[in-house]
Amino acid sequence: GPLQSNKINHALACVDAIESLDSPALASKIDARATGTLPVFVEVNVSGEATKHGCAPSDVAALIDAVEASAHLQLAGFMTVGLNSPVEADVRAAYAQLRGIRDEVAARLGVEESDLALSMGMSRDLEWAIAEGATIVRLGTAIFGERRA
């Protein structure tokens, strides 16, 4: 889920990176409290689903500007939670959109695309995510099984 402002200090004490940066305001708050370089992933809601977090694709440029202007944040890549659909073409289209955003930002910043990770895909759709360029997948269900009610 999203990182709440009142949890930033706790998060900074126990994480090596933040994968849920979704606004310039949050970037500013994290930067003000960080004491060293902190890799961050911009979370983008490419599915457009109201139940998903992340900035809109149209807001990515402003968020990248905030990260670039910060003293402590280092852009490590992009993250999304996939479309909740059994239709491969739809899920892959959303992942392809995030890859396209990453590629545009890499070109704008003058870095290699491979310098910016893509964190996308979970146990149910990891093959589709990898096919679309994922470099990080989240495999909780595959490792630990279904959540208990």
Question: What is each model feature region?
Answer:
Residues 139, 145-149:
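Short C-terminal tail/terminal secondary-structure segment
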